[in-house]
């Protein structure tokens, strides 16, 4: 902390954030209790449902549950709008759905919940129990997310979702260190604050250099892929109106590499899971000089330590770290350079469509 304690974080309520961290820890206990109830009642499949950013956020949990789960566990990531027209053959009245909505009014999710309830499917939500979605699933099936106090990252939502998913795994005998994970991440918000402070000067530098670029590419994989999409689509496309291309490390070499040329910024997000080998291949290509493009940026979550956290848990918190670095701090600094308010929209929520 000594190296970063004097750094101010722009547009960020530090004390409020730590208070939110204490509150989200308590909310996590409620998510754990929901998972216990699901386990005791039994289930044949788990569905993670979202739209847009919430769909992206659930991607990391889908990855983790498939990584740590047994071969009989069925976990599916579904988009509410798509499910409304296509359904899913594996969903039955014994299935369980976890969804999330900050607004509590997402129409596609509301429509899906109505249909699922008619099927007898149990639906749980991370949302305000007094909102439309909360009322649709019932207050006893909701956990309210804490306010963000100026923080634009998704790490608290990740934490709550992980409490649910990892607890289900724990009750199946697949994630025996669940209690240790909860204990070691109880005060992780202090570390997330320190990571913000450490990254802030670099975020400012990157924003000044690339925020006004005509076109930018973002590459990620594994546990970080959902956050890669979320940052590039929800923050830069939706909130900054930037032209973006996001691509996985494994697909990068099957077409997208031909778009590289001098002057095109390329961001590579490197994670800490099996797919890091794929990220390493992309990094080797970017740094080889063969494209003549020197505007590449490597952001590696492994460079950001969390004291007291077991190495086994790094893969779980890596999306939290990336969200802190990009969705929060880099976005705030882009906003300053572009002078484009992150809350301004031309079409989104402006009228019915």
Roles of regions detected by a PLM:
Residues 1-353:
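Conserved N-terminal alpha-helical segment that immediately precedes and caps sugar-phosphate-binding
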């Amino acid at each position: 902390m000594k190296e970063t304690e004097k750094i101010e974080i722009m547009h960020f309520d530090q004390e409020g954030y730590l208070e939110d961290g204490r509150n989200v820890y308590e909310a996590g206990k409620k998510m754990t209790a929901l998972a216990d109830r699901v386990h005791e009642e039994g289930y044949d499949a788990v569905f993670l449902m979202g739209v847009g950013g919430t769909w992206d956020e659930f991607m990391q949990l889908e990855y983790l549950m498939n990584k740590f789960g047994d071969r009989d566990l069925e976990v599916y990531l579904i988009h509410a709008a798509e499910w409304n027209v296509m359904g899913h053959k594996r969903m039955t009245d014994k299935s369980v759905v976890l969804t999330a909505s900050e607004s509590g009014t997402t129409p596609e999710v509301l429509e899906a919940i109505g249909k699922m309830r008619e099927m007898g499917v149990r639906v749980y939500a991370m949302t305000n129990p007094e909102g439309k979605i909360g009322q649709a699933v019932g207050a006893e099936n909701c956990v309210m997310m804490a306010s963000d106090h100026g923080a634009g990252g998704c790490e608290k939502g990740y934490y709550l979702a992980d409490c649910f998913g990892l607890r289900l795994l724990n009750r199946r005998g697949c994630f025996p260190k669940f209690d240790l994970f909860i204990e070691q991440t109880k005060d992780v918000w202090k570390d997330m604050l320190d990571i913000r402070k450490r990254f802030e000067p670099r975020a400012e530098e990157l924003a000044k250099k690339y925020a006004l670029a005509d076109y930018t590419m973002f590459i990620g994989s594994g546990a970080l892929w959902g956050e890669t999409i979320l940052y590039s689509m929800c923050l830069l496309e939706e909130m900054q109106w930037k032209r973006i291309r996001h691509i996985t490390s494994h697909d990068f070499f099957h077409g997208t590499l031909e778009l590289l040329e001098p002057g095109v910024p390329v961001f590579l997000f490197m994670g800490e899971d099996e797919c890091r080998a794929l990220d390493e291949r992309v990094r080797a290509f970017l740094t080889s000089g063969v494209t003549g493009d020197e505007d590449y940026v490597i952001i590696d979550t492994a460079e950001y330590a969390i004291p007291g956290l077991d190495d086994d848990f790094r893969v779980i918190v890596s999306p939290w770290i990336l969200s802190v670095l990009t969705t929060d701090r880099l976005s705030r600094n882009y906003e300053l350079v572009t002078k484009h308010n992150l809350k301004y929209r031309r079409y989104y929520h402006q009228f019915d469509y």
